[in-house]
């Protein structure tokens, strides 16, 4: 009896921690789920930020990932079609920090916030064994670009 009551009471908590991922595209949901598992496996802190801040992941035609600043991350179709799981994971890590800043009301300035988010992403990539060199190079490049603005 107690186990049924406990299950009923805890079930909404379980549901609230799930990120909604639409089942569209050619295996996109699976790729995003794999990326989330990579984050969980190699950086539990960043995984917790992602699951605390992001409630939904959508897909868009922009050439870069973005967020609504509230709880939704929009991944570029181009990134999903490329199929690099670590690239998808890096986007999720980066954008979840933007959401956290937005929810906290931080007014860091756009360029400074990008530097922090790319450093956060870079830190994640350094935790992933055999992370693609081009992902690390891109994060370093973006840190340089946004640092000099």
Annotate each PLM feature.
Residues 90-103:
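Active-site recognition of the HExxH zinc-binding catalytic motif
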Residues 18-73, 77-80:
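Auxiliary, metal-adjacent structural segments of Zn-dependent hydrolase domains
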Residues 4-14:
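Sec-dependent N-terminal signal peptides
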Residues 75-92:
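Short pre-active-site segment immediately N-terminal to the catalytic Zn-binding motif
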Residues 110-145:
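Post-HExxH zinc-binding segment in Zn-dependent metallohydrolases
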């Amino acid at each position: 009896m107690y186990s049924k009551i406990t299950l009923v009471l805890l079930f909404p908590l379980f549901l609230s921690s799930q990120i909604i991922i639409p089942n569209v595209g050619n295996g996109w949901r699976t790729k995003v789920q794999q990326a989330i598992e990579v984050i969980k496996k190699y950086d539990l802190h960043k995984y917790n930020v992602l699951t605390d801040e992001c409630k939904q992941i959508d897909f868009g035609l922009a050439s870069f990932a973005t967020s609504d600043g509230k709880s939704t991350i929009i991944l570029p179709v181009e990134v999903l079609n490329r199929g690099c799981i670590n690239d998808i994971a890096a986007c999720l890590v980066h954008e979840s920090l933007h959401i956290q800043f937005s929810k906290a009301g931080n007014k860091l300035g756009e360029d400074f916030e990008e530097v922090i988010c790319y450093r956060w992403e870079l830190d994640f990539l350094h935790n992933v064994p055999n992370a693609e060199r081009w992902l690390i190079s891109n994060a370093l490049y973006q840190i340089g670009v946004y640092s000099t603005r």
